[in-house]
Amino acid sequence: MCKVFENVNTGGVPLTVFELVTATYATRDFDLRKDWVQCRNTICGFGDTLRTDLFDGIDETTFLTTVCLYTSYLNKQSGKTNTVSCKKKDVLGLPYESYIANRDVVLSGFKIAKEFLLRDQCVFRQRDLPYTTQLIPLAAICAVLGKSKCNEPNTIKTLSRWYWCGILGEMYGGANETRYAYDIEDMVEEVNGRPNAMHTINSAVFSSTRLLTLQTRLSAAYKGIMALLYKEKCRDFMNNTTIDIVNSMLESPDIHHIFPEAYCEKMGIKRERYNSIINKTPILPATNRSIGGNAPSEYLGAILKKVDGLTENELQARVESHFINYAELKADDFNGYFIDRAKSLLNLIEKAMNKPVTDRDAENTLDQFGASLA
């Protein structure tokens, strides 16, 4: 019945997958919509002692798709099916019995996934989450492995590499159902030390010139690189704060220019350069106000005067925690600083993906940067 009436209802309004499954489960005297409200409260952590909005963007279809992916994986493992699949038709056909049997373990998978992101990846807020779509395989993988296995160092290392390859390789921007199936099979096998194709890890590529086109937080890779800076314990220039789950909620750092926009415009620096992620970093509001539109040499001096007891050596350490060359910044040497920071960000990306950026000295890189990034 669901498949027949998938496209229109009696009013001619398209029905969502969730509405169709809700109608099917209603024949079993089960209110899926009411159940989803309870599931959403659990996923979002309403009532938690320390709650962030990280998972507030997860909707009912995302949750159903995750339950379907987990169920399909179990079915293949038990020999009931030959493939893992969570496409629209599979979600529509998710049996009521399977939903009831697997819902709670998938909810636990989301909880484990949230801990993984908050604790291990320094992704704290919904606005900083690179992909909501990647949470589907992540939660399903965590549900299969369980909390104890997910907390093992080798598991964290394996899942971290997969997670960052997916983000920095920008692998989850389109139709992803086939990738989800690869991911759950590959990662469970990899964690358990068995051969697998590692589709997402092996397919992920980061190009050096992508740094120039990462200009806004609309990009997953842009958000990802900022999270990597948090993960590396970058410290605020003025108050020395590192960004953790508590500070991200209390002080809400934002992403600002290192060489200020007004200064760059005055100096004739191209927007393609000064507005790229290479010239941006997480900064607290008070520090950003102190920076203003001034040259770095001016605002560094102003910060030293403003913060009691702050030595230049300490300020240098704070600045360099953002992978910024302090000497070049203090000298207002935009070109030297820009190339140096591009290299440092590529090093950070290579570390997260555990694979090399292969075009650091390619002709296209040389053309666009005017120097090798090797």
Question: Where are the language model's segments positioned?
Answer:
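Short conserved micro-motifs at the rims of enzyme active sites and ligand-binding pockets
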Residues: 1-3, 78-79, 149-151, 171-172, ...
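Short Cys/His-centered divalent metal-binding micro-motifs
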Residues: 276-308
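C-terminal structured domain segments
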Residues: 297, 301-336
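A cross-family structural signal marking well-folded subdomains
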Residues: 19-22, 50-209
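Acidic, carboxylate-rich catalytic segments that either coordinate divalent cations
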Residues: 170, 203, 215, 221, ...
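Basic- and aromatic-enriched surface patches that contact anionic nucleotides/nucleic acids
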Residues: 1-60, 64-74, 125, 153, ...
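Histidine-centered nuclease catalytic patch
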Residues: 245-279, 295
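Intrinsically disordered, low-complexity N-proximal targeting/linker segments that flank membranes
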Residues: 167-255, 263
